[in-house]
């Protein structure tokens, strides 16, 4: 019996010594590789600790350098190297990696230069499995040339069941994970020379993406932004109290994709400003259905909900230099099937928008808008109804834009139903009113009334209320492909107004 125990103890001792010896070998190998990278100027660190019992190691005050890109951390800890996975499966595997206080500075230059990346030494196709990656209290910055375009402050990130597999050609991105959690602080991203995006907090878990205080802010004042424009462009000032994606999914198989069962946005303030004194942008504009079709990734949002939206649109007029404006209050939007996948399917679901709002803050307005993403002619239908619209409400836009002033009793009801494609639109328009007068204004600073032209104009305004009985047909409204869909829709409305009152 003693002999058996002795053999068993010797066996255990040999295994233990072998394990410790293997760890010593691995420790020295890691240290040798680190020394080589230090000599090449790719890495620097203060201390290296290897735990022979747990097959774990730690680096203190670490800095990685690749060209202009620099990644530093107060410490990096790698827990439990799994030798058996490498011996039997050829996979480098560790239980966990924790990176404390990472500072990531990424740099891109637009100037052409020789690629300084090291040549593939044969190890870069090695599959790597990591049970968990944690980044705690990190900061990130990304610059293009001398301009810092992105910063993210005080973020925590956790990935679970990470696989890095360069050889798997079916993955667009050779990095996959089962779950992710992000708790991020302030983000700042320069969208363009005109706009900057900011947010106060970003939280991601396996079920939802939650964003607070998202803002798209102008980089210039309304007076100054036109000085940097080559052609007309909207200046946007938009804030979202909260943006939430529920039941989302990222896909990196074959084609990058994103889906969510619900995208909700709450408490939105949107101010859009356009100056028509700037040269026209004559590039062709896409219909919204084509925009979705042409996305470089698959997108599928089952339901979109916007609540408590206040929207203002301002336009500086080319002829007068005056600013016309319209606004919508308490807007609620619900949309279904915002998707480009699978495009080309005969049963591709119709994209639907249902909108309710207060036009000019007082008049109820509802709109239903439909289109088919997979239709190459970009067919659509948009219907709606407005009620109790005071002519005076229209003057904030009519006076600067058309040099006309509307007066009279409120328009009791207004209905429209337009359908078409990217070329032409037709439909019906109805306006119920009793007494509407049009005053044509003089082209002077006082905006006094041109009595003669006003008298002639009102001879042609229909004073009797026939609209309750007969719809007005709107026919063959041609779309200007250099203008937006909303300009197209506005032209349909104007055609209906002209046929109704004149």
Labelled PLM ranges:
Residues 40-41, 68-80, 147-162, 190-199, ...:
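Amphipathic hydrophobic-ligand
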Residues 1-42, 145-150, 154-156:
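N-terminal type II signal-anchor transmembrane helix
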Residues 2-8, 370-372, 378, 385, ...:
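Extended terminal
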Residues 44-111, 119-155, 160-215, 227-275, ...:
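Flexible beta-edge/linker motif
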Residues 9-11, 15, 123, 226, ...:
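Mature-chain termini and adjacent capping regions
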Residues 121-139, 250, 285-430, 491, ...:
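Solvent-exposed beta-strand/coil patches in large extracellular/periplasmic or lumenal scaffold regions
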